[in-house]
Amino acid sequence: MKKKDSHINRRTVLRTSVIGIFGLSLPNQILANYSFAGIGKISHKGNIPAHFPNIDPEIISEVVGKSHFDLERVKALVDVRPELAKSVWEWRFGDFESAIGAASHVGRRDIALYLIGKGARPTIFTFAMLGAFEVVKSMIEFAPGIQKVMGPHGISLLDHAYAGERMIDKMTDPEVTGLKQTIDYLETLGNASGEKYLDVSPDEQKKYLGDYKYGDGMKDGFTIQLNMRKLLSLGPIGDFGGALYKIGENKFTYNGAPSVKISFDIRNDIIYSLTITDPEVAIVAHKIS
């Protein structure tokens, strides 16, 4: 019995060795006679999406957007596909924001903690909002100057810590203490409140407000309005946008993006157009309202 088994094993070894030696040079038709019959069969429901194998960009956008305010919808999306907890979206002009970054700058610690539990990658901005004092302090000590880095939408590290006070009534005493320590520490540094931009008075803001067109299409233009923080913001016509920070006479930057500049053509205190420039394009949009 042992001899027979030995004979079978020897034949098996020889056969597989030959395939191993010559397999790379065998024609595809010969290789197909072996165990490759199942390759190429795809099981799916309906048509394969055009974006496959990437996740639908609209879903990614929704996860990031809803992470600002809608925990239940975020759960509905992320519970099914936990990798969405790592979602990142570019709003416009290089303004990148992750789902956890969204929850962090609006002070939604409940959403942030849920996303962390699903595999999201917290940053120093998240830890500042959560009041993780020792973590924030150790990161700044390890990389001095990191406190000056701006978060999504050009929001500062200190403002993230302030945002942590939003849910203070649902925090434990140790959590409240940690948040207070974090805020005090960042205030003491003196440079964690972000870039210093020129002030724009409410009266000055008014002259920039309105719609600007650069083409014949309905969406070929921008709307300048005030955002929730009472700052000038620029977005597609009729839609929300990013903050405009003043850097010079009738000159602004978009959400603090260093390579994006917005300037206005003003004559006799009347605005005629705006020009947006980045490293690749320059667009002139004329004021229509």
Where are these regions (language model features)?
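Ankyrin-repeat C-terminal turn/loop position
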Residues: 82-83, 119-120, 144-145, 191
